[in-house]
């Protein structure tokens, strides 16, 4: 880690951080959540009734921290400590980071009622508000305020996080979700057009063509895991974003691909319409540069979540915007194959 990072004061111990916010001696209660990284959450209620959430995380707890090569002090904690100025309306809601034994603790206000519900449908005005905030985040050079040695997520590790190759490794390591990912990729291979199944196997085994294409596009600071459950809509117009564990510098295609596929249970419009609404929010012309971003968003999305599309299609689900999951799988497969042809 660079001297610039080490210029920051040492992480305080957790009691010091809690005392700073009037939470010394306040009991913690377990907080149920929908995350699947392994991080642990508790809620604390201060004497004035204000509620807070404490997130404890470490390499030992968190498989994503391990496989993405996170810093031992965790990149999200480094982000909180540097506290970069984010563009309106985006907010980093964290109040501080501390050391708690072998874990890193992050303190934030309790955003219950502000965060969007996990895997629940949203309406179009809500989607527009999220896309406007996302476009603002991507336009601003906020990431340039962080030192060169900031431990950004490696983009190749991010893209390969959920491939069949990765799932095989997780299963062999005894991680329980490895079998679910493998089962999803098996379903994808059964139900997707053969050309799409072959393309996903090819890119999983050798992602260099995709990575090379991404390297040709401009990069910016990304949240990295923009599930709707990580997005809050505050009454004052602010949009707090939590769970920056996989923040990275990469083309917006990486963020858009994951946004489309990870929020399939909540999005009120088909993927092409959402991409076009984002483009307009970002002020991007509908030109060759955008066409390249769009192609790579499709390829990235299917690489990361083809397994889930296989499971959803096999289950016969219907999506909030009206397509069946099988129709959605057909769209993604067709568009990915066409985008893959343009990679050549």
Where does each model-flagged region fall?
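Conserved NTP-binding catalytic cores of kinases and kinase-like/nucleotidyltransferase enzymes
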Residues: 1-102, 210-214, 234-239, 338-344
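Active-site activation/catalytic loop segments of kinase-like enzymes and analogous catalytic loops
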Residues: 78, 252-284, 299-324
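Conserved structural core of kinase catalytic domains
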Residues: 96-127
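Conserved kinase catalytic-core helix
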Residues: 117-157
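Active-site catalytic-loop/activation-segment of kinase and kinase-like phosphoryl-transfer enzymes
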Residues: 150-210
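Protein kinase catalytic-loop region centered on the HRD/HxD motif
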Residues: 214-220
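Catalytic-loop of the protein kinase fold
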Residues: 221-223, 228
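Catalytic activation segment of kinase domains across protein kinase-like and atypical kinase folds
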Residues: 229-258
């Amino acid at each position: 880690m660079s001297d610039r990072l080490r210029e920051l004061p040492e992480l305080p111990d957790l009691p010091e951080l809690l005392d700073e916010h009037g939470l010394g001696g306040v009991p913690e209660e377990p907080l149920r959540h929908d995350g699947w990284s392994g991080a642990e959450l508790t809620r604390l209620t201060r004497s004035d009734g204000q509620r807070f959430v404490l997130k404890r995380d470490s390499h030992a707890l968190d498989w994503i921290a391990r496989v993405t090569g996170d810093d031992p002090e965790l990149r999200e904690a480094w982000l909180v400590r540097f506290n970069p100025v984010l563009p309106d309306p985006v907010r980093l809601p964290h109040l501080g980071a501390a050391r708690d034994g072998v874990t890193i603790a992050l303190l934030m206000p309790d955003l219950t009622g502000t965060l969007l519900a996990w895997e629940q449908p949203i309406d179009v005005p809500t989607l527009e508000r999220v896309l406007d905030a996302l476009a603002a985040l991507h336009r601003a050079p906020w990431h340039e305020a962080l030192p060169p040695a900031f431990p950004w997520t490696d983009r190749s590790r991010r893209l390969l996080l959920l491939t069949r190759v990765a799932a095989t490794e997780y299963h062999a390591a005894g991680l329980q979700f490895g079998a679910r990912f493998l089962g999803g990729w098996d379903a994808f291979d059964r139900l997707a057009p053969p050309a799409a199944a072959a393309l996903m196997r090819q890119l999983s085994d050798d992602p260099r063509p995709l990575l090379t294409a991404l390297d040709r596009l401009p990069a910016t600071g990304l949240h990295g895991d923009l599930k709707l459950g990580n997005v809050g809509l505050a009454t004052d117009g602010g949009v707090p974003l939590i769970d920056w564990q996989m923040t990275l510098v990469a083309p917006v295609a990486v963020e858009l691909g994951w946004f489309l596929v990870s929020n399939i249970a909540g999005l009120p419009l088909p993927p092409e319409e959402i991409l076009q609404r984002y483009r307009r929010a970002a002020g991007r012309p509908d030109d060759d540069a955008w066409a390249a971003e769009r192609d790579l968003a499709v390829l990235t999305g299917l690489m990361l979540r083809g397994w889930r599309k296989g499971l959803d299609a096999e289950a016969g689900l219907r999506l909030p915007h009206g397509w069946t999951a099988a129709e959605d799988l057909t769209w993604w497969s067709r568009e990915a194959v066409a985008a893959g042809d343009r990679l050549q």
